[in-house]
Amino acid sequence: MMLEARDISFGYGDRRLYDGLSLSFAPDERVALSAPSGFGKSTLCRILAGYEKPWAGQVLVDGSPLPRPGRGAALPVQLILQHPETAVDPRLRMRKTLAQAGEVPERIIEGLGIRETWMTRFPHELSGGELQRFCIARALAAKPKYLVADEISTMLDSVTQAQIWRFLLSECREQGIGLVLVSHSPALTQRVATRVVDLASL
């Protein structure tokens, strides 16, 4: 099941970020998007996951248009953000946040090190690393075909980074999930990615 960005054009106001950009991703790939700061990598992540509508062009999954978030359809592309606090409802306890994706397999909860005591807390009562684990668990529980990970471990300590990436890569391999990632860490990109796309050269 291919993920394809076809002839994407997008910008803000008079500033055009992309003009006829085309990319494709296979389900067995882990693709890093590389470009200078301010180039629009996060914007492209949002477009690939359906959270931003391009001026022109479309995103396809297995040849069909990507469903838009919030329309009741199971989303084949899940977006994980750098700042998890922006991706959760601050009024919900974490157990209800997880439940938004349906039933979360115990292997995901255990693999990400999510503690039972965290389940009854609100987002503001958790650290960034703890909250990010919930966001990743929710994304995986949705049984996506692709994950788009936008700087998901930048704000985390090295131990938490290693644990999260180890589990995430294992799940992607075992469940056949394609991965698109953005990271400013060359070491992480080298360790994780099977292919690097230099957006500035396209």
Where are these regions (language model features)?
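Conserved ABC ATPase signature
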Residues: 122-126, 130
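Hydrophobic anchor residue at the start of the ABC signature
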Residues: 136, 148
